[in-house]
Design a protein with these regions (language model features):
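C-terminal output helix
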Residues: 107, 125-135
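Acidic catalytic/metal-coordinating carboxylates
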Residues: 54-57, 80-83
Length: 146
């Protein structure tokens, strides 16, 4: 005889079957962080574990939160995203970094990739375009630019 299967247990089992990618958002603009956080929260495979406003804060948050992927602005006051990416990759080589740029300057994108980022996205792109890049970064170490 089949008994009823509690929906809560079913939900918990399904939820535990979905692999999650831990993401840290880094941008000196709190509105950008807020928009990205809300957008990424709609994907059950992604877990935004924290945010940071500076490169220095990003480095310490990586140590504290152990994200798999860091989505980071390139231009920030004090320690920029390029220097922070170098520091993070030196200390935590397994962490994947995706750069965000609001400038059309290819130098910044190239410098970010050389610092260890696996991709660089222009901030004018739809935040939804970031999702596949985060999924890819969370799963491998290949390099891409958009």
């Amino acid at each position: 005889m089949y008994g009823t299967f509690p929906s809560r247990l079913l939900f918990h089992r399904l939820e535990s079957m979905v692999a999650t990618i831990r993401v840290l958002l880094v941008d000196d603009d709190s509105l950008v962080r807020q928009i990205l956080s809300r957008m990424l929260a709609s994907y059950p495979e992604l877990d935004v574990v924290g945010q940071a406003a500076t490169g220095e804060e990003a480095v310490s948050r990586v140590e504290e939160l152990s994200p798999q992927v860091v989505v980071m602005d390139i231009r920030m006051p004090k320690m920029d995203g390029i220097a922070a990416a170098r520091e993070i990759k030196q200390r935590y080589p397994q962490v994947q970094i995706i750069g965000l740029s609001e400038y059309g300057n290819g130098y910044n994108a190239d410098a970010m990739l050389k610092a260890g980022a696996v991709a660089v996205f222009h901030k004018s792109k739809s935040p939804e375009e970031l999702y596949p890049a985060i999924m890819k970064a969370g799963g491998d170490n290949s390099t891409a630019s958009a």
